[in-house]
Amino acid sequence: MGMYTDFALKFSVSKGDLEVLEILRYMTDSRVPLKRKTPDHPLFSSSRWDIMARSGRSFIDEVDYLDTVDVMLIGEFKNYGGEIRLFLDWIKPHLAWDLIGYSHYEGDLETVPYFIEGPL
């Protein structure tokens, strides 16, 4: 059956980054269509990129009075293709603030922390 990886990532992106927001909405909600072609990045060639954030409590918080959108991706999936690392590599240039989070493979004793410093 395979082993699962739990993960949680919290970050913000600019409201003006429409392509990234559309992809994130698609990743978190299967009812949202993806109308654009995906970027040329290895993440989008992996087999599970589109479902990695649908198996948990992911959400996108779009508050009207802010210039940024807060995103929380929480999930559990089979990270066989290294999708979490690929996602971090893809999202890094789009961060408005720092990214914090972790992942934990169910067969390991240790949790892997993530911290990517934002542009400020």
PLM region spans:
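Short, extreme N-terminal segment that most often corresponds to the first beta-strand
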Residues: 1-33
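Charged interaction segments
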Residues: 38-120
